[in-house]
Amino acid sequence: SATTSLVENGQGDVLIAWENEAFLSVKDDPGEFEIIAPSISVLAQPSVAVVDEVAENRGTEEVSREYLNYLYSDDAQRIAAENYYRPVNQEILEEYSDVFDLNMELKTIDDFGGWQEVQWKHFADGGVFDRIYGN
């Protein structure tokens, strides 16, 4: 990963990273890195789901759903925050205001017109992605 290349191998001068990776890099190598966070960023929330067919075949439907529900519990949100993942629970996020910038303006996909608009504008042939990479 890019984080590994910079942090462990010393390759590169600047890294754009997930928030938690930046915090972990600073924690693992105090004084070696500086985090410069933008005032505006994109709220990226990778999806989590139970894959019904797989869970049914393995007989793990109940425990899978319990785990999924637990991820959003107060206890799990605190564990996430302690590992530098931004909690989705606002009250718990505020408990970790010494770690997370509560004033950062976080944009969602809706702020960019939704997935269909983003796909068309940025990733379709001739879109922003192609122009950046000279395609």
Predicted regions and their residues:
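Extracytoplasmic/secreted envelope proteins and their assembly/folding machinery
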Residues: 3-4, 19, 45, 64-68, ...
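A near-ubiquitous, low-amplitude feature marking generic local secondary-structure context
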Residues: 5-8, 31, 50, 63, ...
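Sec/Tat-exported extracytoplasmic proteins
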Residues: 7, 19, 25-29, 52, ...
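Ligand-binding pocket segment of bilobal, Venus flytrap-like solute-binding proteins
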Residues: 1-38
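Extracellular/periplasmic juxtamembrane helices and adjacent flexible linkers that interface
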Residues: 55-135
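Solvent-exposed, acidic/flexible segments
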Residues: 8, 15, 38-41, 57-64, ...
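Periplasmic-binding protein-like
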Residues: 29-61
